[in-house]
Amino acid sequence: QXGDLVAAGKKVYRQCHACHSVGEGAKNRVGPEQNNLFGRVAGSLPDFRYSKAMKSAGENGLVWTDKSLHEYLKNPRAYVPKTKMIFAGLKKPEDIDAVVAYLKTFDTDGMPDPDASTYTPPNG
């Protein structure tokens, strides 16, 4: 169920919260804020200092989608070599599915996205 997946994602996202924020009033921290992430070109928030690697990835066509975020969260440094993100990655596919579902619930202003209730993980 999408609601259960989102609730699980909120718990898993606690690992991300030290560096990132999401939701109403989200601000850039060590990592960029993550409202309205899906469809965003990687490295494109104007007021965040990205690594050269992340900016280059975006310039070369990396856009955050369900699939690209799944791959990135598995192993950030393998997906975007030389990224500044120090997190090693999420090992469990179900945790990645949950975080993706959770992040999809936030629109540009950090408010609930009505389309998020239709999210189905690519793995099932």
From Swiss-Prot:
Subcellular location field: Periplasm
Pfam families noted in UniProt: Cytochrom_C
A GO CC annotation given for this chain: periplasmic space
InterPro entries in UniProt: Cyt_c-like_dom, Cyt_c-like_dom_sf, Cyt_c_1A/1B
GO biological process, one term: photosynthesis
Biological role stated in the UniProt entry: Cytochrome c2 is found mainly in purple, non-sulfur, photosynthetic bacteria where it functions as the electron donor to the oxidized bacteriochlorophyll in the photophosphorylation pathway. However, it may also have a role in the respiratory chain and is found in some non-photosynthetic bacteria.
Modification after translation: Binds 1 heme c group covalently per subunit.
GO molecular function, one term: electron transfer activity
Name used for this protein in its record: Cytochrome c2
Positions of modified residues (Pyrrolidone carboxylic acid): 1
Keywords assigned: Electron transport, Heme, Iron, Metal-binding, Periplasm, Photosynthesis, Pyrrolidone carboxylic acid, Transport
Cross-referenced Gene3D superfamilies: Cytochrome c-like domain (1.10.760.10)
Origin superkingdom: Bacteria
Main location: periplasm
